[in-house]
Amino acid sequence: MRVLLACECSGAVRDAFLALGHEALSCDLQPSETPGPHYQGDVRDVLAFPWDMIIAFPPCTDLTVSGARWHKAKRENGSLYAGAAFFMLFANHPCQRVAIENPVGIMSSLYRKPDQVIQPWQF
């Protein structure tokens, strides 16, 4: 499978897919923390490739409910809507297998409820 790991610079998830024999590419604005296939740049540059699976870890800075007290300012400066639009790049992608990791946030209201909720204490 061709797997894109978007907004991922640790290389951990990419390396797990590579170890299983998949073709995997991590992509982030930051350089990869480990050697391996990594595109340092805007994910939009590689999003149109024929991926079999996309796992995205978009920044939660402007989307999480823990920052609700700053939502008014984020609406006014546009960062809330920019974060939501970036999230939707993945949600609307035609790839059949898309997973988006994000904490509980405003996307449950703006987009839809998540298919799964996984808590860190479960692992």
Where does each model-flagged region fall?
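Conserved active-site and SAM-binding loop architecture
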Residues: 1-123
